[in-house]
Amino acid sequence: MQFDIEKYWLQEIPDSSLTSVIGEIPKRWGRMDPASRIAVVEIGLLLKQANLLAKNNLLNKEIKAGLITGSKLGSLVTDLAFSKTLEEGVDNASPILFGYTLPNIPLAEAACHYKIIGPVYSIISEKPLDCAIEEANFWLKNDSGISFIIAGELDITPDLENITHQVISAKFKIIKLNHA
């Protein structure tokens, strides 16, 4: 099953093709930034395809897992959108956008939604996916309680003229330690 990223990140109310993957609509969906919506859907799709979600579309509570993404741009799109709200003064600053001005927030949204308990963070790197996979392998080698880590790359480039955005990458993989 493949989704049109450009379509679902703009959906204020997810349609049935999305809810079949994400289950219950996250309470914060309406105020989520595009990167968070992408993370929730893409990570849910990956978990579903790997048969790692229970019937309630949550990760089995016995499984300890993690989420690590690499990014070249971090939360630049949201940072710029937030700064644009400051143009008319601090009283017009968007508290909703401010909450998404850290690059790990999309992962936190996905982790909360699917009840993922384990390391969850983002790394800024010129080789985002490679760096995330390297970090995932480090965790798996050093914490035997972790079943798997979803390593990914998530970057959205801003349109500086209009402060709009275009997805440039959204890739995720399940990384497991190979027991020889």
Predicted regions and their residues:
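Conserved "HGTGT" condensation-loop signature of ketosynthase/thiolase-family condensing enzymes
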Residues: M1-A180
